[in-house]
From Swiss-Prot:
An aminoacyl-tRNA editing enzyme that deacylates mischarged D-aminoacyl-tRNAs. Also deacylates mischarged glycyl-tRNA(Ala), protecting cells against glycine mischarging by AlaRS. Acts via tRNA-based rather than protein-based catalysis; rejects L-amino acids rather than detecting D-amino acids in the active site. By recycling D-aminoacyl-tRNA to D-amino acids and free tRNA molecules, this enzyme counteracts the toxicity associated with the formation of D-aminoacyl-tRNA entities in vivo and helps enforce protein L-homochirality. Its main location: cytoplasm. The gene is dtd. Transmembrane segments: none annotated. One of its GO terms (cellular component) is cytoplasm. This is D-aminoacyl-tRNA deacylase. It comes from Shewanella sp. (strain MR-4).
Length: 145
């Protein structure tokens, strides 16, 4: 399971010219599901995302996690993160989870984060989305479990 996280000062997702999810300070999470992923990996990754210290403390050091910084999550499904780009000039998605598997783990990821008390907005699984963000830093990390 893969989460490309970006520290943002604001981010939003638009589907059919309608904003369906938006946050101010927090993390934009692009979430990719691979075939071997399961609930255990999902919980481990969600915990890591929420606990990862990417926000600056009073000394300007990246030392605060999402909750400590008072941030929110915007979680967007992103199957292309599971692409194999090692050969040729076209990505292979043979390692990506099935749509059913990915939808289930995506929904569980969101529910798990919300259950921890984190304000969590979402995109729309499988939709053509327009994601707008202001990357703060920029700060971007690729987390995998």
């Amino acid at each position: 399971m893969i989460a490309l996280i970006q520290r943002v000062s604001r981010a939003s997702v638009v589907v059919d010219n309608q904003t369906i999810g938006a946050i101010d300070k927090g993390l934009l999470v692009l979430l990719g599901v691979e075939r071997e992923d399961n609930r255990e990996k999902m919980e481990k990754l969600a915990t890591k995302v929420m606990s990862y210290r990417v926000f600056s403390d009073e000394n300007g050091k990246m030392n605060l996690n999402l909750t400590q910084a008072g941030g929110s999550l915007l979680v967007v499904s992103q199957f292309t993160l599971a692409a194999d780009t090692g050969r040729g000039l076209r990505p292979s998605f043979s390692g990506a989870g099935t749509p059913e598997q990915a939808l289930g783990l995506y929904e569980e990821f969101v529910a798990f984060c919300r259950a921890q008390g984190v304000t969590t907005e979402t995109g729309q699984f499988g939709a053509d989305m327009k994601v707008e963000l202001v990357n703060d830093g920029p700060v971007t990390f690729n987390l995998q479990v």
